[in-house]
Amino acid sequence: MGLLEFLGFGNKTKQVKEFMAKGAVIIDVRTEGEFKSGHIEGSKNIPLHEISSKIDAIKKLQKPIIACCRSGMRSGQANMILKNNGIESMNGGGWLSLKNKL
């Protein structure tokens, strides 16, 4: 597995569909201002700098998580934090690209 695949930048369409079939929650890790300028309907906004402090609340959702942001870099970081805390998650990449996969 290459570095980009490890960070979640491979072909995601199949994985996104599998996660959504399991009732995944989409967490947009952009800033509140970025989120307000446009986002995926039904997604939750938890900025990247708040992810670590929200782990318990995210675990209580008992759902897989698809993290997204503007380009995929911040969601890649969020994905690693979530995985390191035992949460089933994936990097959904940029929110506009992810929206087209739903």
Predicted regions: what they are:
Residues 28:
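N-terminal glycine-rich beta->alpha transition that marks the start or flank
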Residues 69:
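Short cysteine clusters
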Residues 2-15, 22-24, 32-63, 73-102:
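Rhodanese-like catalytic fold shared by cysteine-dependent sulfurtransferases
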